[in-house]
Amino acid sequence: MKWVNKGTVERVKQEFKDEVKYYETKHTKGFEVSHDFLKPLLKFLKERERFLHFVDMTCIDFPEHPNRFQGVYILYNPEENERVIVKSWAKDGKLPTVEDLWPGAKWAEREAYDMFGVVFEGHENLRRMFMWEGYEHYPLRKDFPLQGIPEVELPSLTEVLHGRTDPPSHDFELVHTKLPTLEDLERTEKARLKKKAELVLNWGPLHPGTHGTIWFLFDLEGEKVVQSDVILGQLHRGMEKLAENLHYFQFIPYTDRMDYISAICNELAYVETVERLLGVEVPEKARYIRTMFAELQRINSHLLWLGTGALDLGALTVFLYAFREREKIMDIIEGNAGYRLTSCFLRIGGVHYDLAEGTLDVVKHFIKDFPNRLKEYHTLLTRNRIWLRRTKDVGVITREDVHNYGLSGPVARGSGVPYDLRKLQPYAAYDEVEFDIPVGEVGDVYDRYLVRMEEMAQSVRIIEQCVQKLEKLPKDAPYLNKEHPAVIPPKEDVFHDLESMVKSFRVVVHGEDAPPGEVYFAGENPRGELGFFIYSKGGGKPYRTRIRSGALYNLSIFPKLIQGRTIADAIALLGSLDPVVGETDR
């Protein structure tokens, strides 16, 4: 994938003269524009230069700068396969909304307001995204402490139970950060959705059909949904704040806990981003191991989607069959990483371990058997009359919707948009294997089902080629770039080699010593584009880490799709979007 070309740069300069400044770093290209010309520039890029696809929007806090907050917009041109970054300083803590250009910016702007306090003028309903209404602080500001602001005093257990006020026997602080009260949650609900019809129905945040702590609000006229909104944040853990206070390698385990169904895919997107910033080359063996395990994880994720989605619509058998194959994949992952879910298998510069003895034989057995299992799933569902009635012509997403909402993954490809970063921006070993990109025609729930089913078949093709390549490589081929100064050596080297021990100590204590600069890179997660924007001022920790969640943007179109449909369709529709709350909330 390229960055903005010279022709576009020249046309922008001719149109906006001195109001726009072109900038270029080692890994990115874009424009810096004054506040008053931000929206005209973005409109020009969309309508004249065909940067149709909204990728992401966030802010960076520079307390020492007079304007303090800088807005960062990332756009994509699907015709030229180019990205561009646009930056603009807020004026008096305000930026113009671009929700009218890209509806997908609605949630991104809410998040920037929630985390930084930046106000977006003209926004339809600017509310907090993850925190509750009435919360007074902005967590991603640099003056907000990592541990939060203790401001609520809680009595000790001895005082509550026995009425004694003597010091407790533990050393826990009695003053804690705020938690939302029931009144706060009620205020949040009413601020999100102004009642227009007969009844506001709460679906979630604890309901088996939501597959996670997502809180849906439906304004109903009978069984028809007049309007809806989604309240997130029940699983918000401040991932981006944590990333800014950790060394680069220390954040790898946290990526596992976002989309915890696809931990290795998360790790892969993150370490590929950091490796570009640090200039780390990855050995060939590690690239193929990464690719093989990422595709195993993709099948694993799609099997969970298939089993639970079918179960929600009444097909119990498919659920049992899908979990049978899923267990085999998780056994392979556990045998190599040591953990079934939060594997923490990848490292900056390669992978943590070489392949366990017999791994390739087990993988070959699995990919030989799995196509037959896939046929079983098709037999049970693909031409099933009930399945067709529940999925055909439900939740139709157009190609225009894909670009306007920043949709990606199977959701985008189900609408006929071949947006797959494994092809458009090859990483790991994807440029050395052959596979096809399945796309839909209508863009409904059924098309998204067919795309994911075919993706599993394509993953088998990729895994098969990875196995063949790994069998040809020498057993002692390197799986980690030990020579790079930013790479932590394997534990066995640290225990037996003085130089490795000193290097390990230096990196663990002081960090990787990244150069100043910025980088945006994304991986093709089972839920779509999982991107990381890292802004570095040098040193062992990033100044700003932005996590672009594909699951979040895919979920953002839900209120539009459910409008005018019945509550029963919400189950099928949400299942086809396949969000994981650990990633949406971060």
Curated annotation (Swiss-Prot):
Its EC number is 7.1.1.-. It holds the Pfam family Complex1_30kDa. InterPro entries: NADH_Q_OxRdtase_suD, NADH_quin_OxRdtase_su_C/D-like, NADH_UbQ_OxRdtase_30kDa_su, NDH-1_subunit_CD, NDH1_su_D/H, NiFe-Hase_large. Its main location: membrane. This is NADH-quinone oxidoreductase subunit C/D 2. In the N-terminal section; belongs to the complex I 30 kDa subunit family. GO terms for molecular function: NAD binding; NADH dehydrogenase (ubiquinone) activity; NADH:ubiquinone reductase (non-electrogenic) activity; quinone binding. NDH-1 shuttles electrons from NADH, via FMN and iron-sulfur (Fe-S) centers, to quinones in the respiratory chain. The immediate electron acceptor for the enzyme in this species is believed to be ubiquinone. Couples the redox reaction to proton translocation (for every two electrons transferred, four hydrogen ions are translocated across the cytoplasmic membrane), and thus conserves the redox energy in a proton gradient. HAMAP family: NDH1_NuoCD_2 (MF_01397), NDH1_NuoD (MF_01358). It catalyses: a quinone + NADH + 5 H(+)(in) = a quinol + NAD(+) + 4 H(+)(out). GO terms for cellular component: NADH dehydrogenase complex; plasma membrane. Residues 1-173 are annotated as: NADH dehydrogenase I subunit C. It is found in: Cell inner membrane. NDH-1 is composed of 13 different subunits. Subunits NuoB, CD, E, F, and G constitute the peripheral sector of the complex. It comes from Aquifex aeolicus (strain VF5). Residues 197-586 are annotated as: NADH dehydrogenase I subunit D. Signal peptide: none annotated. Keywords: Cell inner membrane, Cell membrane, Membrane, Multifunctional enzyme, NAD, Quinone, Translocase, Transport, Ubiquinone. It is a peripheral membrane protein.
